[in-house]
Amino acid sequence: MKIGVVGLGLIGGSIFKALEALNYDVIGVSDSQNGLQENISNDFNNLKDCEMVFVATPMNKTLDVLQKLEEYLPKSTIVADTCSLKEFVSNKNYKYNFIPTHPMAGTEFKGFEHSFKELFEGAKWVVCNRGLAQEKNNSLA
């Protein structure tokens, strides 16, 4: 399974590192970490073959990223955000399968350099329901 992560700060970086440790094919998209590794760039086109994409950008950029992803992803792609607020991202219909989520994890630090693969171990992860049509996607998430 190919999984994308947009935004490689503490949360996105930790998702990225955890998935890599589990041997998933992971693609990172980040302006600040562009080129850090072979599988990290700032090119959204690299996400087009992903079955799932996590959006872990700062809240003020999340809606723009979710809209931009519509240009690159097929409608079968599952996209999950990690914002702590849900209404502003949930009130829109997207071309792909969107699941609003919120990981209940973090530290006092920010940035990829402070991310670590164990951040979510033992943590709760809230998955918000957007209706019965989303049940299949929620089970995949």
Question: Where is each model-derived feature located?
Answer:
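NAD(P)+-binding Rossmann beta1-loop-alpha1 motif at the extreme N-terminus of oxidoreductases
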Residues: 1-44
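Hydrophobic/aromatic beta-strand patches that form the interior of the parallel beta-sheet core
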Residues: 27-29, 80, 99, 126
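Short, charged/polar "capping" segments at the starts of alpha-helices
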Residues: 33-37, 88-89, 134-136
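Rossmann-like NAD(P)-binding element
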Residues: 44-73, 78
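Glycine-rich, N-terminal phosphate-binding loop of Rossmann-like dinucleotide-binding domains
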Residues: 56-58, 83, 129
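Rossmann-like NAD(P)(H) cofactor-binding subdomain of soluble oxidoreductases
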Residues: 64-113
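Rossmann-fold dinucleotide-binding core
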Residues: 92-141
